[in-house]
Amino acid sequence: MGEMVRIAVVHDEKLLRSALVQLLRSDDTLDVSSHCLDADGPELSAALPADVCVVDGECLTGPEDAGAGRLRARYGDRLVVLATAKRPGVLRRAFDGGALGLVDKNAPAHRLITAVHTVARGERFLDETLTVALLKGAEMPLTTRELGVLTLASQGAPIAEIAARLHLSRGTVRNYMATAVRKVGARNRVDAIRIVQSAGWT
């Protein structure tokens, strides 16, 4: 037997995390551990000594993206991100963040194992089924500021709070909101939030 490859599995949902661990342990060259990103807090990076980290792309979303930052700080590009073509924004963030592996959640189990070994060698792995979605993610029409305004609005923040948190005037926030609604082809603010969330841009 060759040298073992240490794998850390990160997922917010216990059942799915356990299923991923069992799948990966079917390969006896993989030494697998698992953790919940939220529960481990800032100590996460020190707690997971591994060669490759397998993480659900949905764990890397959010306005602060703090969990993604901790994982990248610990593993660099040795990330295998699980994603779907329905969420091009999630794919784009993972790719732009330097993750070497992008695996379709609908792919056969052996694809994940292949991806892990590929990334462990420092090589890129991209499921062909995700290629078009990855390109769509690059077409996200909103600026960082417009996306930030919509993200805060999606959390229920009123105009005044958004203005205070982003150090903008209320009028400027309204302008950003109106521009974002127009750019994504939405009917209103609620529709714009739905569109960007469905695409995985927030």
From Swiss-Prot:
This is Response regulator RamR. Residues 159-178 bind DNA. Changing L102Y: Restores aerial hyphae formation in ramR deletion mutants, activates RamC expression. InterPro entries: CheY-like_superfamily (IPR011006), Sig_transdc_resp-reg_C-effctor (IPR016032), Tscrpt_reg_LuxR_C (IPR000792), WalR-like (IPR039420), WH-like_DNA-bd_sf (IPR036388). Homodimer, in the absence of phosphorylation. Disruption phenotype: Deletion of ramR leads to loss of aerial hyphae and sporulation on rich solid medium after 4 days growth; by 5 days aerial hyphae and RamC are expressed. Deletion on rich medium leads to an initially bald (bld, no aerial hyphae) phenotype; after 4 days develops a substantial aerial mycelium. Wild-type mycelium on minimal medium. No expression of SapB, normal expression of chaplins. A complete chaplin-negative plus ram-negative strain (deletion of ramR or the ramC-ramS-ramA-ramB operon) leads to the complete loss of robust aerial hyphae. Changing K105A: Does not restore aerial hyphae formation in ramR deletion mutants, does not activate RamC expression, does not bind ramC promoter, does not form homodimers. The N-terminal response regulatory domain is atypical as it does not have conserved residues usually found in these domains; it is required for both homodimerization and DNA-binding. The C-terminal domain does not bind DNA alone, nor does it form homodimers. At very high concentrations overexpression of the C-terminal domain has a dominant-negative effect on DNA-binding by the whole protein. Residues 135-200 form the HTH luxR-type domain. One of its GO terms (biological process) is regulation of DNA-templated transcription. The keyword Transcription applies. Induction: Transcription about 8-10 hours before aerial hyphae formation commences, peaks at 38 hours just before aerial hyphae formation starts, decreases rapidly and stops as sporulation commences about 70 hours. Not autoregulated. May be phosphorylated by an unknown kinase, probably on Asp-56. Pfam families: GerE. A transcription factor required for aerial hyphae formation on rich medium. Activates transcription of ramC. Might be part of a two-component regulatory system. Binds the promoter of ramC. Non-phosphorylated protein cooperatively binds multiple sites in the ramC promoter. Has not been seen to autophosphorylate using the small molecule phosphodonors phosphoramidate, acetyl phosphate or carbamoyl phosphate. Residues 1-121 are annotated as: Response regulatory. GO terms for molecular function: DNA binding. Keywords: Activator, DNA-binding, Phosphoprotein, Transcription, Transcription regulation.
